[in-house]
Structures are given as structure tokens and as C-alpha cells.
């Protein structure tokens, strides 16, 4: 007998968030996952599933969490454009969103847990006014909270915009277009768990107030999730901790602590690593027999010993491993013009962290075209970040950019977007590539500084120079302390990496990574103040001394760019049938021509190596787009020679006759004495007859522009001169006085 399925555990929970309905469905879909939910915000719908392995993964010294944010093209009613017609590898935006969701969630898991946990957020429909990234973060928090996976959440997230000084929670699509910032804030019930921001040079106070507005808004959703958890949440499962036991750690710490202190007390990463090698060997020689089959745990104890020492130095003595004060920056160096023939280059060094950035200018058509669930978008400015293994002294094969590289590149890109000139001000596409040459912490802020140097070296008229700096944090109970410009060891053993980029006047980007549950408002405010002071120091004392302002001229190896505007209804004439006309222009002038329609106008971009050829292409295009008028001058190409004159094409499809009498200021016997087929000459439109035929003159150009005098005028001038008397021989040859 057939039976109808019933979903006894199906539940629907509803609330309102920033003036729009938020609905959560559970118990109907994805019943084999540890936890799952379907979240609707407006018409945006995201499905989230959480699964965990039953047993811990062996041989790892970290918590194996993966977060995947998946964009489905059906969510916006599109079929993927690839050959396979299905979604492929995640987009850059999807990877960045996965990282944003991961960052506030990860610290709330027990660090000793080794069970694999997977969180998959699938975007199923998109309402442009309700960002799916925020819905996915909320959905992930709900799914973990109601699952049996141990977690110390919940968290909530929101987007904060600012328009005319007013803070807007989860701004609509139109509001996001005019907002002075795009800030994502995640919170627990008491602390700020994550900040990701891009801003148009806003003040520290504006950014702080936006963060606090987001933190306050998140509290309503956190309470909402707590209610859901209380009603349908599962009991949390027990897991086996793979952390070394207390006695083992204390024994190894007692044996190695003093030697480790000596090893750590240096500002040279290589020296530190060399000092630590014999300590590891000595510890293993003593404890491998005591704790057989526990080599990984012995290494973990040594790692924890280093962490214990560094944190004690910072909290109790305000001592950093390299001897700096808490607000001191490592030695700095800036250099431009490092690499020949490239369009621009800048190298920024901070201690043992060194980043070389190369700037490349290209025609506007080199912009990146993106087609995702946000619709078709364009990126004229692109930043890529590379972190090769040699930068940390390791030998690993290059596998292409990973999530970390994509995330760091996006931060540097976002930091400079507000100062990049508009396409009208600087009609180029821009690509920056930051190569990390050596790394001892804070490479992404270094790539921001290197990018500013490279842009200025390339002659890009940026609105203001941008610098980046990181701020670290050490906490213990109610005690906490911040430090500026953290190096690798302080990043590994500290609680925070708070990266801020900005100009002298304001913030352009923030990225905050935490290893603790969150920050208090006081911690956020202090981090903003310290990074502002530090980036001003970097700009004034180092970067602007290397190059004070963008170069006035572009590199001779950069393409020359010229623009013009034509009526939109003339674009088809410039392109021609099957692109015939525009191809001829590009071939003849050795240039690249790009046209973008903007309402009633067409913006034309011409790029090439030779400025004169670019100008020639612009002139041809303008001639096509504007009907010739009597008195106008054009540069044309001789296409045919006749006995009575030469035909000259001033633009594709626009040809006129230069009569033989109008070829030169002097009498011309043969047309070929003056011009031949293929010659480029400047002509003036003398007349357009009733049939639209053009009568052109080279002779008149020579008179009007070059100031030449026609031959018949010279004859007339000679004829008008008074003649000397026939017998006046002054100054002449006197036959009677011949010698």
C-alpha cells in the first residue's frame, strides 16, 4: 500500500531583519545531514547543510573545517555560459564569501577537535536587495546551532552602508551603489567576531560607528537563533580530543623552555629556525621512548611551549621577540622603477617581509568581464597576489592561487579602488601583480604599499597614496594588549590580525582575522587608532620619500591612449559591416579601437604604441562620425590617380576629388609629380555639391596652414614692382667698364 510522506519535524520560524522578512525552514530537506536549514530573506533563498565525520582525522594538528559557498546560476534564471553548461570551479567572489563565513565561525569550535566538519551554503534564488552572502552566514550559524556538532555559537552577520552620514543595515542594491562603505560585521552575543570592509576614505569614527551599528543589529538575529536552537536543537556529540595531555606538555616545557627562550629572542626568522632545530632533536631524543607513537604530539607540545613564552613576554613584560616596542614598526624601505621595461614597479620591504608589485596598463577592452549571480559586471582594475614557497624558504610545487592568495589579493584590490582614477580621467585597464619575495608576516599590507608605489611609478594619477598595516592582539582573561606590525611569530601565537588600509584622511579597507571568539568595542577602537597613526608614518617617512607623486609621463613601453566621443547612431558606421571599417582602421594605423555605448553617445578608446598613429585613427573615426563641412580639414589617403586630379579618402566611404589645380601652390603638369596612390595628405573641403560630392584642396592647406604663397601670386607681385630706367646700371654688369 502506498503511503503519503509526512514531515513531522518540519518547522518554520519567522522574524524581521532590517525591515524585511526573514524565514527559516527546517526538518523537511536534507535529513541525513547533521544539521540543515533553508533560509529566505526577501526573495533570496540559501540552503545550508552541516556534516561532521564520526571519527577524528588522524595525523593532523589542526581543526579540519571546510566552508563552501556555492553560487548556482539557476538562482538568477540563467544557464551557465560554459561549454558544459554547468557550474565549474567556484568564482573568486564565492571563494571570498566562503572565507568571510569561515572567519567568525571557526574560532567558536574547540581547537582540540579533529573531526572533519563541512558547511555547504548553496544559493538557490537571489533578490538583488537581499545579499545572499549575509543570508548564507546566518544560515550557517543556524545549521550548526541546531546540529549535534559541538560549537560555541551562535553568530549573526549583516552588511552596513553609510549614505549622507546615516548607517544603513543590509542596504538595498540601489543604496549599495551610492554608499560610502560596504562593511560586513559578524557578532556573537557579546563581541565583534569578524569585520570585512571596503570604504571611500571614511574616518576612523565613521568606521567604528558602522561596526557598532552592525554589532547592535546582529543581536536580534542571535536571539532568534537561540530560540530556534532551544526548540529543535540536537544534543551535542562527544569527541575525542587529540591535544597532548597536561602532564606531557608540562614535562616537555620544563625540559626545553629555557633553550626555546634563547632561540626565539632574535629578529631574524632564519636564525630562529636554525636555533630551534637542535632543540626539536633533543626533545625527541628524550621523549620519543617515553611517549611512543606520539611524535606529532611532542611537536605540538614544543609549539605550545613557544606560544606560552611569546605570550608571556608580551603580556607580562611588553617584550616582543625582535626587541621592538608594542607600537614600533620594523625597519622599512621603499623603491620604485625596480624592473626595466614594465610599465611601473614598486618594492616595499618591512623587516623580513618584502613584496614587489608590477603595474601593467592596457586598453580598456582588457578589463575583466564577470558573469555570476550578481549579473554581468566589469573590472577595469585588477590585483593579483602570489605567495611562492621560496618566500618562506620552502620547496613546494606551484599549484596556482589558493583561497589565501585570492583573499589577500582581494584585500589589496579593495584597498586601492577608492583612489583609482575614473575611465574618463585615465582611460586604461590596470593590472597589478604582487609577488611576495620573502614573508615574515603582514604580506597583504605590504602588497598594498607596493601597489601604491607601482601605480605612482607607472604614472597613474591616483587620488591619494594608500598604505596598509596590521595590528595584533594578546588576551588573557580580562587582560589584553595590542601591538602594531605583527611578524609571523606574533601572528601564529597571537589572537588577532587586524589589517587596515587607508590614506592620510581615511580608511579604504579592513580585514580582521581572529583566533578568539571576538573583540570588545574598546579593542576595535584602539586598533583603528593605532593603525591610523602607523599608516601615516609609513606614507610620510618611507613611501612618499621614494616617490612623492605619480610620474607625469607614462612609460615609453606603455600603450598610448586617446579617446573621443561620437553620436551613438554613428557607432555602426565606425564598426562597418562585419567589422570591416574598424578592422581597416586598426590595420592601417596599427592601433586597437574599443567602443562603449553610453546612452546617446559612444565612447571611443584608441590605444597603440605610436601617438601619431593613434591620433590618425581618432581623426578617421571623427570624420566618419561627423559629416564633412566646407572649410574643415582632414587627413586623407590617395586612392586613385586620374589625369585631372587625385581621389582622396578622408574616411571609409567618404571620398573626394582634389583637382590637379588644387594639388600644389605652383603649377602642376602631372598629378604624380605631387602625389601617388597610398600617400597620406591633408586636404580642405572646399565645396560639397548638390550630389554630395566633395571637392577637396591640398593647395589651400599649404596656403592656410603652411603659409606658402601661390606661384601666380608671386608672378603678380613681380609684375607689380616698378621697373628701373633702362640706362640705370647700378649694381649691374657694365659692359662699358669691363676689365
Give the positions of each predicted feature.
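Glycine-rich, flexible beta-strand/loop modules in the N-terminal catalytic cores of phosphate-handling
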Residues: 33-118, 123-125, 130, 196, ...
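Conserved phosphate/anionic-ligand binding catalytic regions in large, soluble enzymes, centered on
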Residues: 35-37, 130-148, 336-359, 440-460, ...
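Flexible, glycine/charged-enriched surface loops at secondary-structure junctions
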Residues: 111-117, 152-154, 221-239, 270-271, ...
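Short, hydrophobic beta-strand segments
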Residues: 121, 193-198, 239-243, 254-264, ...
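Mobile "lid/hinge" segments at catalytic clefts and subdomain interfaces of large enzymes
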Residues: 148-264, 455-552
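Single-stranded RNA-binding regions, centering on S1/OB-family and related RNA-binding modules
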Residues: 557-559, 563-739
Amino acid at each position: 500500500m502506498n503511503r503519503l510522506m509526512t514531515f513531522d519535524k518540519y518547522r518554520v520560524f519567522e522574524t524581521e531583519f532590517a525591515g524585511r522578512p526573514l524565514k527559516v525552514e527546517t526538518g523537511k530537506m536534507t535529513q541525513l545531514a547533521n544539521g540543515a536549514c533553508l533560509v529566505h530573506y526577501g526573495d533570496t533563498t540559501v540552503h545550508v547543510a552541516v556534516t561532521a565525520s564520526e571519527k577524528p582525522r588522524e595525523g593532523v594538528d589542526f581543526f579540519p573545517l571546510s566552508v563552501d559557498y556555492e553560487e548556482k546560476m539557476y538562482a538568477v534564471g540563467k544557464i551557465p555560459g560554459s561549454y558544459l553548461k554547468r557550474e565549474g570551479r567556484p568564482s573568486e567572489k564565492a571563494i571570498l564569501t566562503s572565507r568571510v563565513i569561515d572567519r567568525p565561525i571557526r574560532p567558536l569550535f574547540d581547537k582540540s577537535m579533529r573531526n572533519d566538519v563541512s558547511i555547504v551554503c548553496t544559493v538557490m534564488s537571489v533578490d538583488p536587495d537581499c545579499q545572499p552572502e549575509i543570508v548564507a552566514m546566518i544560515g550557517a550559524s543556524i545549521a550548526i546551532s541546531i546540529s549535534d556538532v559541538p560549537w560555541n555559537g551562535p553568530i549573526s552577520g549583516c552588511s552596513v552602508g553609510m549614505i549622507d552620514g546615516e548607517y544603513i543595515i543590509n542596504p538595498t542594491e540601489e543604496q549599495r551603489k551610492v554608499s560610502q562603505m560596504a562593511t560586513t560585521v559578524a557578532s556573537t552575543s557579546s563581541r565583534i567576531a569578524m569585520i570585512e570592509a571596503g570604504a571611500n576614505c571614511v574616518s576612523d569614527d565613521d568606521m567604528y560607528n558602522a561596526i557598532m551599528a552592525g554589532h547592535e543589529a546582529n543581536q536580534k538575529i542571535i536571539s532568534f537563533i537561540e530560540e530556534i536552537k532551544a526548540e529543535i536543537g540536537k544534543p551535542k556529540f562527544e569527541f575525542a580530543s587529540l591535544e597532548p595531555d597536561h602532564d606531557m606538555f608540562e614535562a616537555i616545557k620544563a625540559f626545553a623552555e629555557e633553550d626555546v627562550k634563547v632561540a626565539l629572542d632574535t629578529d631574524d626568522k632564519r636564525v630562529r629556525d636554525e636555533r630551534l632545530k637542535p632543540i626539536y632533536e633533543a626533545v625527541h631524543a628524550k621523549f620519543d621512548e617515553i611517549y611512543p607513537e606520539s611524535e606529532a604530539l611532542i611537536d605540538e607540545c614544543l609549539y605550545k611551549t613557544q606560544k606560552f613564552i611569546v605570550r608571556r613576554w608580551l603580556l607580562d613584560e611588553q617584550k616582543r621577540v625582535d626587541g621592538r616596542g608594542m607600537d614600533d614598526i620594523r625597519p622599512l624601505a621603499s623603491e620604485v622603477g625596480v624592473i626595466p621595461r614594465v610599465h611601473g614597479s614598486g618594492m616595499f620591504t618591512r623587516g623580513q617581509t618584502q613584496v614587489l608589485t608590477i603595474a601593467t596598463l592596457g586598453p580598456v577592452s582588457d578589463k575583466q568581464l564577470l558573469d555570476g549571480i550578481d549579473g554581468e559586471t566589469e573590472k577595469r582594475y585588477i590585483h593579483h597576489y602570489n605567495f611562492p614557497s621560496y618566500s618562506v624558504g620552502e620547496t613546494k610545487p606551484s599549484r596556482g592561487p589558493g583561497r589565501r592568495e585570492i583573499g589577500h589579493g582581494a584585500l589589496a584590490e579593495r584597498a586601492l579602488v577608492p583612489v583609482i582614477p575614473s575611465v574618463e580621467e585615465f582611460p586604461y585597464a590596470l593590472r597589478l601583480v604582487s609577488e611576495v619575495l620573502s614573508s615574515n608576516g603582514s604580506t597583504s599590507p605590504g602588497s598594498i604599499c607596493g601597489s601604491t608605489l607601482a601605480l605612482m611609478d607607472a604614472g597613474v594619477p591616483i587620488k591619494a597614496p594608500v598604505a596598509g598595516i596590521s595590528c595584533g592582539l594578546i588576551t588573557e582573561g580580562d587582560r589584553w594588549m595590542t601591538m602594531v606590525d605583527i611578524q609571523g611569530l606574533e601572528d601564529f601565537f597571537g589572537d588577532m590580525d587586524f589589517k587596515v588600509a587607508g590614506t592620510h584622511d581615511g580608511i579604504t579597507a579592513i580585514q580582521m582575522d581572529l583566533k578568539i571568539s571576538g573583540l570588545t568595542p574598546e579593542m576595535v577602537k584602539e586598533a583603528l587608532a593605532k593603525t591610523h597613526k602607523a599608516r601615516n608614518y609609513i606614507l610620510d617617512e618611507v613611501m612618499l620619500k621614494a616617490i612623492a607623486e605619480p610620474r607625469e609621463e607614462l612609460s615609453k613601453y606603455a600603450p598610448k591612449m586617446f579617446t573621443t566621443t561620437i553620436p551613438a547612431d554613428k557607432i555602426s558606421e565606425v564598426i562597418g559591416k562585419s567589422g570591416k571599417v574598424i578592422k581597416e582602421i586598426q590595420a592601417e594605423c596599427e592601433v586597437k579601437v574599443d567602443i562603449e555605448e553610453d546612452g546617446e553617445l559612444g565612447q571611443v578608446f584608441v590605444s597603440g604604441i605610436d601617438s601619431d598613429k593613434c591620433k590618425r585613427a581618432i581623426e578617421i573615426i571623427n570624420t566618419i562620425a561627423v559629416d564633412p563641412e566646407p572649410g574643415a580639414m582632414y587627413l586623407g589617403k590617395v586612392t586613385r590617380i586620374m589625369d585631372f586630379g587625385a581621389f582622396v579618402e578622408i574616411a571609409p566611404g567618404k571620398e573626394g576629388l582634389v583637382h590637379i589645380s588644387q594639388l600644389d601652390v605652383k603649377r602642376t603638369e602631372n598629378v604624380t609629380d605631387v602625389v601617388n596612390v597610398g600617400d597620406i595628405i591633408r586636404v580642405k573641403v572646399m565645396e560639397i555639391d548638390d550630389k554630395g560630392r566633395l571637392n577637396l584642396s591640398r593647395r589651400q592647406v599649404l596656403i592656410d596652414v603652411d603659409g606658402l604663397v601661390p606661384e601666380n601670386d608671386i608672378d603678380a607681385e613681380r609684375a607689380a614692382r616698378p621697373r628701373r630706367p633702362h640706362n640705370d646700371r647700378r649694381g649691374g654688369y657694365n659692359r662699358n667698364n669691363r676689365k
